Swiss-Prot record:
It comes from Dictyoglomus turgidum (strain DSM 6724 / Z-1310). One of its GO terms (biological process) is translation. GO terms for cellular component: ribonucleoprotein complex; ribosome. The keyword Zinc does not apply. Belongs to the bacterial ribosomal protein bS21 family. It holds the Pfam family Ribosomal_S21. GO terms for molecular function: structural constituent of ribosome. NCBIfam families: S21p. InterPro entries: Ribosomal_bS21, Ribosomal_bS21_sf. This is Small ribosomal subunit protein bS21.
């Protein structure tokens, strides 16, 4: 679970900004987006192939 503690003189906006950044670093947002809808196994394979080609 991602946790951010708000300091005494810290605004809520800056704490929220840090929280969102932490979520993005942990990969939580990407995971939520990936599970937003059903992805067929063939689509998963194609996405992974394209991703591996992109890395090369």
């Amino acid at each position: 679970m991602t946790e951010v503690r708000v300091g005494k003189d810290e605004s809520l906006d800056s704490a929220l900004k840090r929280f969102k950044k932490k979520l993005q670093e942990d990969g939580v947002l990407a995971d939520i987006r990936r599970h937003e809808y059903y992805e067929k196994p063939s689509e998963k394979r194609n996405r992974k192939k394209a991703q591996s080609k992109k890395k090369k």
